[in-house]
């Protein structure tokens, strides 16, 4: 269960603007379905396109740029997140952004993959990811406005099951379709159609109004700014921000492990990658999300997140030192995927425990942007490490950063604890 501190803070954070509070929450499986397009577009890039990159003349470092282009907008999305809070309703934003994301995945699949088209493809990926970020924002805003404090762990699990399950769906199914269908664009068309089907789950959600409709546009902007400043002036909000910006529990190695040249170190091919980094990984990661949500019902999310970060570092070390066989690639990829699910559920619980309900899209995506920053730069660094020193060194590099991040956070707890900030 959440601590009384979390419950009191979450309740008080949402109290001033009663129009944003929704008394009846849907079953959390709704968040799973609604969040699938967000995860699936990311999986299409990080698994399907990334695996094929080195087969089409790109280096491992260049292949890492594909996921880097996607994550670039994901750690900058705090800039446009306030638009979701102060303009259209969350439902309208979801339908618009999901439709445009469907167009985006079609465009990505239609661009030929190779050194000569890399620049164009990176631009398409970045634009599609920018639009896709609004899919996530709209769901996060509705979810934050309907989740009672004592359900944070449970909701976090279902929510991240949609994110990471979607990554597995977009990656595994996307790669299989790209390899089996006669034309690459057909895979994008099928993925886009699946995105649009997820809109049907909106009928089970309340239509949370934009803050501008409740208080006027200028007042809404002021409120969003005030809510954000108030959150970051608390010990809980500041510590959550510090933990998010550190390279803890990122799962960044997954993007590198999907590349054909890296997977070949263990003797793994397209089928193993599609299953272990795609479809099966999605299922295993979803299981990790539920285990992480259960854990966060019993531990403070900060404690759970830090511990999971150390566990993920240990998994990377073990994968790096074990024999380089296909069976080891399969086993450790699945263990790694489970640990990533734990980490992502703990991240969502950490954020929901800190943001309350007002200006939810903005506040959630400030934390998400902070968390995506280390995922972005560490992913690029791991690609370079794999290029220069090999797959084993890449995994040990990730583990080193993960342990260092937890040490820095432990020291930050001492410093913030001595401050005069509100709890």
Language-model region placement:
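Juxtamembrane intracellular "pre-TM" segments in multi-pass secondary transporters
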Residues: 9-25, 209-239
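Helix-loop boundary and gating motifs at the non-cytosolic
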Residues: 13-74, 239, 243, 249-263
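Cytoplasmic membrane-interface "Motif A"-like loop-to-helix N-cap segments
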Residues: 86-99, 297-309
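Intracellular juxtamembrane helix-capping segments at the cytosolic ends
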Residues: 134-147, 342-356
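C-terminal transmembrane helical hairpin of 12-TM major facilitator-type secondary transporters
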Residues: 302-347
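C-terminal ends and interior cores of transmembrane alpha-helices
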Residues: 99-115, 310-324
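Helix-to-loop junctions at the C-terminal end of transmembrane segments
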Residues: 76-89, 287-301, 386-387
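Glycine-rich segments within core transmembrane alpha-helices of 12-TM secondary carriers
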Residues: 154-172, 368-379
């Amino acid at each position: 269960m959440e601590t009384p501190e979390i419950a009191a803070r979450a309740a008080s954070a949402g109290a001033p603007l009663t129009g944003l509070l929704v008394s009846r929450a849907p079953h959390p499986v709704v968040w799973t379905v609604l969040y699938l397009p967000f995860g699936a577009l990311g999986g299409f890039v990080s698994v399907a396109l990334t695996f094929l990159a080195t087969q089409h003349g790109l280096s491992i470092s260049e292949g890492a740029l594909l996921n880097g282009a996607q994550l670039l907008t994901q750690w900058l999305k705090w800039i446009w997140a306030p638009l979701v809070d102060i303009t259209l309703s969350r439902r309208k934003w979801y339908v618009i952004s999901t439709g445009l994301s469907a167009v985006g995945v079609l465009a990505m699949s239609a661009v030929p993959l190779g050194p000569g088209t890399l620049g164009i493809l990176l631009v398409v990926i970045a634009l599609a990811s920018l639009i896709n970020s609004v899919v996530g924002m709209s769901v996060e805003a509705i979810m934050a406005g309907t989740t009672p404090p004592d359900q944070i762990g449970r909701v976090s699990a279902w929510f991240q099951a949609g994110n990471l399950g979607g990554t597995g769906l977009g990656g595994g199914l996307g790669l299989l379709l790209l390899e089996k269908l006669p034309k690459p664009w057909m895979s994008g068309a099928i993925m886009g159609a699946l995105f649009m089907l997820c809109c049907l789950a909106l009928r089970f959600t309340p239509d949370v109004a934009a803050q501008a409709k409740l208080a006027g546009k200028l007042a809404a902007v002021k409120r969003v700014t005030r809510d954000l400043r108030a959150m970051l002036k608390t010990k809980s909000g500041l510590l959550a921000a510090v933990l998010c910006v550190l390279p803890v529990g990122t799962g960044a190695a997954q993007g590198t492990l999907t590349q054909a040249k890296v997977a070949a170190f263990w003797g793994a091919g397209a089928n193993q990658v599609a299953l272990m980094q795609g479809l099966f990984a999605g299922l295993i990661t979803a299981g990790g999300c539920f285990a992480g949500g259960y854990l966060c019902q019993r531990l403070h999310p900060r404690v759970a997140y830090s511990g999971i970060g150390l566990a993920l570092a240990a998994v990377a070390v073990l994968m790096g030192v074990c024999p380089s066989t296909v069976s080891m690639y399969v086993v450790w990829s699945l263990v790694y995927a489970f640990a990533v699910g734990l980490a992502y559920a703990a991240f969502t619980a950490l954020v929901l425990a800190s943001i309350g309900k007002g200006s939810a899209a903005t506040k959630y995506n400030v934390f998400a942007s902070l968390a995506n920053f280390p995922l972005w730069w560490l992913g690029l660094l791991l690609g370079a490490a794999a290029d220069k020193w090999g797959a084993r060194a890449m995994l040990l590099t990730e583990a080193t950063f993960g342990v260092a991040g937890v040490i820095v956070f432990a020291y930050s707890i001492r410093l913030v604890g001595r401050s005069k900030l509100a709890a």
